[in-house]
Design a protein with these regions (language model features):
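Histidine-centered nuclease catalytic patch
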Residues: 264-295, 304-317
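Mixed-charge, low-complexity interaction segments
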Residues: 2-247, 312-329
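Hydrophobic/aromatic-lined pockets within catalytic cores
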Residues: 52-55, 255, 270, 284, ...
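Active-site-proximal structural scaffolding
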Residues: 21, 40, 255-258, 272-275, ...
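Long, contiguous hydrophobic alpha-helical segments, chiefly transmembrane helices and signal peptides
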Residues: 31-32, 39-44, 279-282, 293-297
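Short, charged/polar micro-motifs that form catalytic or ligand-binding hotspots
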Residues: 29-37, 252-255, 283-287
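Short Fe-S-cluster ligation motifs
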Residues: 293-306, 325-335
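Short cysteine-rich loop/turn motifs with clustered Cys
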Residues: 245-275, 297
Length: 335
């Protein structure tokens, strides 16, 4: 098992030694070196996702759709900037611009599923075309630059046609590349994944995606220094993973014995008709600790969103409920 030390003190990408002898792994590692924009990470991540589903041939369009789906939650839910802002206040990253454009076109929620996002992208295909095409200008070619150093021939970065031909020649005569490109133009341009690279990626999907996420988080944190716990904001967290169901069972036991009033409405919380949610929104504290979780009217949960509650009208009621929670668990061993 060969290890690639990423950024020396960072994530170690582990690839089976067999592939070290048959593929140019160092060139693969270079695919995320010196990015100018975040969508370089999402490009490789989308490719790995597609290959893990045994997709051998795709297009720029399909890859970019996957990129939008993968970045959607971070941008929409937490307003994360993928590559910072320009001096004039405009968004720098083309992928982020595509997401913001789709937001204006549709009523798709921040926590929409991948399938829902892909369906809406297709619905607004014409409107998104120009924004998506901007993402194809350099990254698909620059991502392979780490392999080009093996060739004495220099790449002509000024011509897509000549770059496509150059990539084909490198693949045929110098070293096998993860993908080559077809002759069509724009978003319809074909992407062909090499079978041996597909096998390597499928055998090492978890390690590779872990490495991509590590590099992505480093980049995003540098561009969003004010955002805490950014690693938890890349995708919606599964409620089972967060174990909120256990907290709900605890409150359910208390509701069988005592009256608990909703912090916001003052009305009694009824068994099986409430949600467990955070008093201080999860995006601020980045944890699901018991002190911050409370039962509340399920009809109000969505409108509460990620806004901080006003202190004076609500904290006293919240504190009284929390006191009841801890008092009840001490006095009733069955809860």
């Amino acid at each position: 098992m060969a290890e690639r030390d990423i950024a020396k003190a960072g994530y170690q990408l582990k690839i089976d030694g067999f592939y070290e002898n048959t593929l140019e792994i160092e060139g693969f590692v270079q695919m995320m070196k010196d990015p100018s924009y975040c969508y370089k990470f999402y490009w490789l991540e989308a490719i790995v996702d597609l290959i893990s589903r045994d997709v051998a041939e795709t297009t720029f369009d399909e890859i970019i759709n996957e990129m939008i789906a993968n970045a959607w939650y971070s941008v929409r839910e937490f307003h994360i900037h993928l590559s910072g802002m320009r001096a004039d206040g405009l968004v720098r990253d083309g992928l982020e611009r595509a997401i913001l454009q789709l937001t204006k076109l549709s009523d798709l929620p921040a926590n929409a599923s991948r399938v829902e996002i892909l369906n809406v992208i297709k619905e607004y295909d014409k409107e998104l075309k120009q924004t998506k095409e901007q993402l194809t200008h350099m990254v698909p070619y620059r991502a392979l630059a780490g392999f080009f150093s093996k060739s004495e021939e220099k790449a002509d970065w000024g011509s897509v046609r000549r770059l496509t031909e150059y990539i084909y020649r490198i693949n045929q005569t110098v070293t096998v590349l993860p993908y080559t490109l077809g002759e069509r133009s724009g978003l319809k341009k074909e992407v062909y994944f090499h079978p041996v690279w597909m096998k390597m990626i499928q055998d090492n999907t978890v390690n590779i995606l872990g490495w991509v996420q590590y590099e992505k988080v480093k980049w995003l944190q540098n561009n969003n220094p004010e955002v805490p716990g950014l690693i938890y904001k890349l995708a919606p967290m599964d409620e089972k993973m967060r174990k909120l169901s256990r907290v709900r069972k605890l409150w359910e036991g208390i509701l069988q014995l005592y009256e608990v009033r909703d912090v916001y409405t003052g009305k009694p919380v009824l068994p099986n008709q409430y949600d467990v949610d955070h008093f201080i929104p999860w995006s601020f504290v980045m944890n699901d600790e018991l002190w911050n979780l409370m039962p509340m009217d399920s009809s109000l949960n969505s409108s509460k969103s990620n806004r901080l509650p006003k202190w004076d009208p609500f904290f006293k009621a919240f504190a009284e409920n929390q006191y009841l929670l801890y008092q009840s668990t001490q006095e009733n061993s069955g809860i």
